[in-house]
Design a protein with these regions (language model features):
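Single conserved hydrophobic/aromatic residue that forms the stacking wall/gate
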Residues: 1-8, 12-13
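Short glycine- and Lys/Arg-enriched binding-loop motifs that mark or flank ligand-binding interfaces
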Residues: 4, 137, 154
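Charged/polar, low-hydrophobicity segments characteristic of intrinsically disordered regions
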Residues: 16-25, 67-75, 120-136
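Mid-domain, small-residue-enriched loop/turn segments at the edges of structured enzyme/sensor domains
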Residues: 19, 40-102
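Membrane-embedded alpha-helical core segments of multi-pass
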Residues: 34-35
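Structured C-terminal helix/loop/strand segments within mature extracytoplasmic catalytic/sensor domains
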Residues: 44-49, 92, 96-124, 128-134, ...
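Carbohydrate-binding/catalytic loop surfaces
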Residues: 73-82, 133-145
Length: 202
């Protein structure tokens, strides 16, 4: 069942107590609001991080490791470094999602639209493109501070649909940053702007 209404933007699953929820709602929570509880429920549904890791590798993405759940990483921040990928591999995964027939179009279209309606990270990849005639779908990731006071990760991956049918996928990761989340988000926005301007000029 992939039909579901949009969820409230200020509520996470933890706030809702014991309820039944569709896969569609779980995907909306995790893709649009980066809800870690929804992420872990989906991990469990798919057989755990190792099963998801094997699936990603089966798609041809090798520079990627999914070793722990969100709950495990919050309990031990060092585990955050066990879950990793590269910006190129992440962008390749977005390209595979957009261009290969991984699953029926109804599910693909649902995930596509859910990413377009992402509610987090409006100051990241999307920021320099808000006044452009483009469609942007993206998914953010925001890490905690490590023992040195550095932000472990400030990330955004997504796709951009340009007028005339051209498209591109992009991933920007800021790791172990001494800056705050706002500054790191601005770094991502600046890179997004540079990439957009380059592509529009070529």
């Amino acid at each position: 069942e992939m039909s579901a209404s949009l969820v409230g933007s200020e509520m996470c699953i933890r706030d809702r107590g014991e309820i039944e929820m569709s896969i569609a709602d779980l995907l909306k929570y995790t893709l649009q609001q980066s809800d870690n509880n929804a992420c872990d429920i989906l991990f469990d549904y798919q057989g755990g991080p190792d099963a998801v890791n094997k699936y990603i590798h089966s798609l041809g993405i090798r520079e990627c490791a999914i070793a722990g759940t969100e709950t495990a990483m919050h309990e031990d921040l060092n585990l955050c470094y066990e879950n990793w990928t590269t910006p190129l591999a992440a962008a390749e995964l977005v390209e595979i999602f957009r261009k290969k027939p991984l699953f029926p179009n109804v599910y693909k279209d649902f995930i596509f639209q859910t990413m377009v309606e992402c509610q987090t990270g409006q100051d990241r990849l999307v920021a320099p493109l808000l006044d452009k005639k483009v469609t942007v779908g993206h998914k953010t990731g925001t890490g905690d501070l490590n023992a040195k006071g550095q932000q472990i990760g400030c990330n955004d991956i997504g796709f951009v649909l340009l007028p005339g049918g051209r498209t591109y996928s992009i991933a920007v990761f800021v790791k172990n940053s001494e800056e705050n989340n706002q500054a790191n988000s601005k770094i991502i926005a600046n890179i997004s702007r540079i990439v957009y301007e380059y592509i529009m000029q070529h």
